[in-house]
Amino acid sequence: MEKLSALQEQKGELRKRLSYTTHKLEKLETEFDSTRHYLEIELRRAQEELEKVTEKLRRIQSNYMALQRINQELEDKLYRMGQHYEEEKRALSHEIVALNSHLLEAKVTIDKLSEDNELYRKDCNLAAQLLQCSQTYGRVHKVSELPSDFQERVSLHMEKHGCSLPSPLCHPAYADSVPTCVIAKVLEKPDPASLSSRLSDASARDLAFCDGVEKPGPRPPYKGDIYCSDTALYCPEERRRDRRPSVDAPVTDVGFLRAQNSTDSAAEEEEEAEAAAFPAGFQHEAFPSYAGSLPTSSSYSSFSATSEEKEHAQASTLTASQQAIYLNSRDELFDRKPPATTYEGSPRFAKATAAVAAPLEAEVAPGFGRTMSPYPAETFRFPASPGPQQALMPPNLWSLRAKPGTARLPGEDMRGQWRPLSVEDIGAYSYPVSAAGRASPCSFSERYYGGAGGSPGKKADGRASPLYASYKADSFSEGDDLSQGHLAEPCFLRAGGDLSLSPGRSADPLPGYAPSEGGDGDRLGVQLCGTASSPEPEQGSRDSLEPSSMEASPEMHPAARLSPQQAFPRTGGSGLSRKDSLTKAQLYGTLLN
């Protein structure tokens, strides 16, 4: 029983222990279930978070890929832009180089155009100077004939300088005329650097014709002295066309006129040109009293025409007294109404009209007789037929010599009242012949500027005038011209008389050529009294500034003869030599080409 009770007790204890273990197991199971549930929840939460993180990572990765793609695109775009900019940079560099070259070309073109403009300005000024030097024989510029705009320019120019048109009292045909010098000054283009400078002496002198007088005192150098001495070198064709046609008058038949072309100094070519130059209509008694001339010099065969044209334009501008004397003398010359005593009434022509023309036929060959027609557009009708001596008198001085010859003015006064020679004065002369055989304005301008003095006994060693020296250097040979056979001007020769200048003719405007008969009867000594060696300064000043006359009187002295070597010495003046003229010709040819 004890064993049963012991077994019962063991059994009870085992049951208690079993229930305790079961209860403990149940707790553990419950705890395990709760823990598992918790872990499952945590796992799910972790999975959700993992999914979120994974999604996030996926989004980040997609974003990264998108950004990488964008970066790649941007990189490509930047590369393309860089390439484009490089191309544009290269293109701009090429354009810069091209523009630089264009700028250089433009600069060169501007310089060239500036030089051309300067050359054109100088050429225009040269044309204006040539217009001042040109002859207007029979052709007068009228305001009504000029273009309208140019009329306004001329009127403004003349009003600006206080000038007016010539008065109708001078001549009805020239009441509306405009001096050539004014047209030249209007056409002249001034230097841009000197636009504000004052008027030059030459322009003031050109416009002095409205004042009526020149300022007294020594004259300033003319533009004609500087520029116009080589006018023919600029444009010989125009000068040859503008030059007045020469007329040949044989001594045996003074009514037969033939032209003389002085483009070559060979006598044979001259004669052939003379025979065909003028039509038969000119062969009439238009120049009954104009005398013959001499053979042309062949010393400078190719340069003689140029030297003649040079001296033709050595005095150019028309001034106040020139305008008045020119118009008055031309009115008197071409007036149809005065009787025959108009020119013969003066006592100064009593001896000139009594000249004998008998020796003329024996002294000069008929083929070389020639004189000049001052105005081809107007016909000469002299009231009476003057003698050879009077015919040689320039028409410009026929009215001047009617004035009292005893009035003598001081040198400075005469230099103020008289004016330098102009082309218009040369146009009114019959162009006596120099020893070089040229019936040309050269002879007159040479005598005008070279000869000055009233004493016939003086040698011509005072001739240091630049114009005279230039003329001597270009127009006279070393002795070839003076060695020709016929060296006598027929109008000077009188029957049985030795001719020279009369020292008593103190009021003669200028000493002309003073001829004296040589031993063989046809040698002519030409006396040109120099201003520096004249014993009468007053008369010398007057003579050197008045128009020259070719007058000889019978009361002459044979002691006044000069040999050809003495008559034409080589002066040491400041004029141009032949070499200098040729050099200038080459220079002007180069510039104008």
UniProtKB/Swiss-Prot annotation:
Q: Where is this region: Disordered?
A: 499-593
GO CC terms in record: cytoplasm; membrane; postsynapse; synapse
Where does the record place the modification Phosphoserine? 200, 229, 246, 265, 346, 373, 455, 465, 475, 477, 500, 502, 506, 553, 563
Q: Which UniProt keywords apply?
A: Acetylation, Cytoplasm, Membrane, Methylation, Phosphoprotein
- Provide the topology term for how it sits in the membrane: Peripheral membrane protein
Origin superkingdom = Eukaryota
Q: At what positions is Asymmetric dimethylarginine found?
A: 381
Please list the disulfide bridges: none
A single GO BP? evoked excitatory postsynaptic potential
Q: Does the keyword Membrane apply?
A: yes
Say where the protein is mainly found.
Answer: cytoplasm
What PANTHER family does this protein map onto? BRAIN-ENRICHED GUANYLATE KINASE-ASSOCIATED PROTEIN, TIGHT JUNCTION-ASSOCIATED PROTEIN 1
Subunit structure, interactors included: Interacts with DLG4 and DLGAP1 and forms a ternary complex.
- What does the function comment of this entry state? May sustain the structure of the postsynaptic density (PSD).
Designated name of the protein: Brain-enriched guanylate kinase-associated protein
Q: Which organism is it from?
A: Homo sapiens
